[in-house]
């Protein structure tokens, strides 16, 4: 973190947490990326300058069942997560406890609701934006909403272009 006193990163994947902890400890990591077929290239990635890794912790966790003593924060980011949860409403219900009054909640989602991740009964009844407003309005005020494009490299010649909906909320 450059500015926050404390950052807690949580992911469901223990492999992602192990990789993040390795980067935090070493400052760099060697990674392989697929070029084509079975051809790979090696890269070295580094923690950006000015980041204070000693302020950051990483832990494995389930966004629908976060530990009770996690505390609350000035800012919470849930990135590209909602439409990958079996019960996304569970996370939304927990968010008021995680964000301090006056704090900020940032949600991004590509709104790609798929049965393999979320049963259709748990999808928004309307569009995702309207659903979020109805679920969060009691505890949060929507302060911004816009599209946030991102690109995922699959191979040297194949990329996945996606546009996520980004919403920013202020805790009442």
Residues of each region from the PLM?
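Conserved SAM-binding loop of SAM-dependent methyltransferases across substrates and taxa
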Residues: 1-4
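Conserved SAM/SAH-binding beta-strand->alpha-helix loop
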Residues: 13
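S-adenosyl-L-methionine
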Residues: 22-66
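Conserved Class I S-adenosyl-L-methionine
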Residues: 31-43, 118-147
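A conserved beta-strand element that flanks and buttresses the S-adenosyl-L-methionine
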Residues: 77
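A short glycine-rich, Lys/Arg-flanked "PGG" loop and its adjoining helix->strand segment in the class I
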Residues: 89-102
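Conserved beta-strand signature within the Rossmann-like core of class I S-adenosyl-L-methionine
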Residues: 102-111
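Core SAM-dependent methyltransferase catalytic element
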Residues: 138-141, 145-172
């Amino acid at each position: 973190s450059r500015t926050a006193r404390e950052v807690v990163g949580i992911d469901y994947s223990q492999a992602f947490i192990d990789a993040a902890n390795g980067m935090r400890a070493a400052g760099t990591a060697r990674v392989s990326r697929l070029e084509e077929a079975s051809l790979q290239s090696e890269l070295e990635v580094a923690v950006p300058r000015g980041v204070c890794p000693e302020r950051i912790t990483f832990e494995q966790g389930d966004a629908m069942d976060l530990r009770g003593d996690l505390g609350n924060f000035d800012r919470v980011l849930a990135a590209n997560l909602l439409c990958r949860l079996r019960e996304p409403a569970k996370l939304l219900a927990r968010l008021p406890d995680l964000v301090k009054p006056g704090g900020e909640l940032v949600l991004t989602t590509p709104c790609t609701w798929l049965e393999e991740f979320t049963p259709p009964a748990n999808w928004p009844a309307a569009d995702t934006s309207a659903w979020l407003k109805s679920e969060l309005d009691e505890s949060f005020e929507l302060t911004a909403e816009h599209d946030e494009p991102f690109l995922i490299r699959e191979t040297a010649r194949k990329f996945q272009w996606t546009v996520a909906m980004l919403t920013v909320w202020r805790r009442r």
